[in-house]
Amino acid sequence: MSATQNYGTGRRKTATARVFLRPGTGNISINNRTLDNFFGRETARMVVRQPLELTETVEKFDIYVTVIGGGVSGQAGAIRHGITRALMQYDETLRGALRKAGFVTRDAREVERKKVGLRKARKRPQYSKR
């Protein structure tokens, strides 16, 4: 690995993203596809760009991402987390601003398992008094 590249692993729900930051012009490539091609939803694209816009490094890096697992929002969150970690590896002084925005903390919420005798994780069958 070259010294000019920074790496960050991001996770959200069941998605895992490996993010590589390299000096460049602002291209974001996810699983060898462009950001606009990979995410149909504008909100997902916005989530991915948030740490870059906050730190004003949008045009400074080319970002290469491989992401597996999860759905659209989980993958977007995982990429955001990975970009945040890679930015902190690049410049530790960015940590304060990223922490304040809430990008550093891994969102620990996971899907609750379905229990036996229940319809979903917490939804119970209808109760009949008589």
Swiss-Prot record:
Disulfide bonds: none annotated. PROSITE patterns: RIBOSOMAL_S9 (PS00360). InterPro entries: Ribosomal_Su5_D2-typ_SF, Ribosomal_uS9, Ribosomal_uS9_bac/plastid, Ribosomal_uS9_CS, Ribsml_uS5_D2-typ_fold_subgr. It holds the Pfam family Ribosomal_S9. GO terms for cellular component: cytosolic small ribosomal subunit. GO terms for biological process: translation. Belongs to the universal ribosomal protein uS9 family. HAMAP family: Ribosomal_uS9_B. This is Small ribosomal subunit protein uS9. It comes from Pseudomonas fluorescens (strain SBW25).
